[in-house]
Design a protein with these regions (language model features):
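Bacterial N-terminal signal peptides that target proteins for export
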Residues: 1-11
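Core hydrophobic alpha-helical transmembrane segments of single-pass membrane proteins
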Residues: 12-19
Length: 399
């Protein structure tokens, strides 16, 4: 308790500085509402947290709410202390951005029933069933898939023969992941399947850093994949480590959470990201107008919650038109990311038993829920956070 009290006092001072730092910039309407944002890492160095902060500040400018921002809050007691201090300061909504924040946000929600506590990437909103705790994510697997299509087109342009075929040696990609969680596995599988739709014999090695943000580990991981012959690299880790390693090596890179073109002008291709501004505006609308907020909110291309960056000049010729056509197929339902006809698991065709998520997800799925129906896996339809956590053929985990 003494430790928690010390954290509360330090958090109070820093959070108050956050209020003064941003609310003076609001040029839109003025709302009598404070909203708190808790970030795992400093936004200056983490592409993941930078994406959240920019979206939050954009929503604050457009709606006029008073923003409280606290960075570098670890996945422990400090998160609960920060969330509760924000509630004490009068925040009507508190949002946290990292998977490991969830238990501490739930604890804060129990103590402050009149405050809305919203959490990105979490999985427990339905099972804990608190009236003031919510999860949110987006169908980023579709964005990852399109980024993979972009990667496949680059491999085909760079290494394809007269018929467009790419040798096995050149059809090899690498992927730097943070943790072997469903969020990461779903993302790299989507990316891989997008590339596979263009280069059928593509393979991919994956290595994990076991940290969301560690620039030197991510750089070392990318260098390891390059030494194994990867001709293109992507990542689900939050620093510039992997993109910078690709820039030095002159190997194409597909980034995440935002463009790295400024840092990596010779090798950046495209980036997919979740645009959180629509969600921030949605939760504010629900709060001030007493509307019901979804327990599991899923953003999409349609509502602006999923985005691709501009394609760099390093992309293959015709990439933008090709990818846009694939995007339309995803949106109209004529193509599905996890189509069972496009991958196997241990040499077998996918079945419900092979792909059903494990019990660690904490979600109480209704009796009879089928994840594999109509010829594809229904990602992010039964909860907001990704659930696909199976290693498919063609992807090798090297850790």
């Amino acid at each position: 308790m003494k430790k928690l009290s010390r954290i509360l006092l330090s958090t109070a001072a820093l959070s108050l500085m956050s209020i003064g730092g941003l609310t003076g910039c609001n040029k839109g309407p003025s709302l009598n509402l404070k909203v708190g944002l808790i970030l795992l890492h400093p936004a200056k160095s983490s592409t993941y947290d930078k994406n959240f902060r920019e979206a939050f500040e954009r929503a604050a400018r457009e709606l006029g709410f008073k923003a409280v921002i606290k960075e570098n809050i670890d996945e422990g007691d400090e998160c609960q202390a920060t969330a509760e201090e924000m509630a004490e300061q009068g925040c009507g909504i508190v949002f946290a951005d990292s998977f490991g924040h969830e238990d501490y946000m739930i604890a804060a929600a129990r103590n402050y029933p009149d405050v809305m506590f919203c959490h990105a990437t979490g999985v427990q909103a339905r099972s804990v069933n608190l009236p003031n705790f919510y999860n949110a994510f987006a169908s980023i697997y579709q964005g990852r898939y399109l980024a993979g299509v972009t990667a496949g087109l680059k491999l085909k342009e760079k290494y394809g023969d007269a018929n467009g075929a790419v040798s096995d040696a050149n059809a090899k990609m690498g992927y730097v992941g943070a943790y072997p969680y469903a969020e990461v596995k779903s993302g790299y599988t989507s990316f891989f399947l997008g590339a596979k739709s263009v280069v059928p014999n593509v393979t991919m090695e994956v290595t994990f850093t076991n940290e969301w943000y560690h620039e030197s580990k991510e750089k070392t991981a990318a260098e390891l994949l390059l030494s194994h012959g990867a001709k293109l690299i992507s990542q689900h880790a939050d620093s510039y480590g992997a993109p910078n390693a690709c820039e030095v090596a002159g190997v194409p890179n597909v980034s995440y959470n935002g463009s790295t073109l400024k840092n990596c002008p010779k090798t950046f291709l495209v980036s997919s990201k979740i645009n959180w501004t629509p969600y921030f505006k949605h939760i504010v609308d629900c709060k001030i107008n007493n509307k019901t907020l979804e327990k599991d909110y899923v953003g999409s291309f349609t509502d602006g919650g999923v985005e691709l960056s501009s394609f760099s000049k390093n992309c293959a010729k015709g990439t933008a038109e090709y990818v846009n056509n694939v995007k339309q197929e995803l949106l109209n339902g004529t193509r599905h990311v996890f189509d069972v006809n496009t991958f196997t698991i241990g040499g077998q065709a996918p079945t419900e038993a092979l792909v059903k998520p494990g019990p660690y997800t904490f979600t109480d799925y209704p009796e009879g829920t089928l994840f594999l129906e109509g010829g594809y896996y229904h990602e992010s339809e039964f909860r907001s956070a990704p659930s696909f956590d199976v290693d498919i053929d063609g992807i090798s985990i090297i850790d």
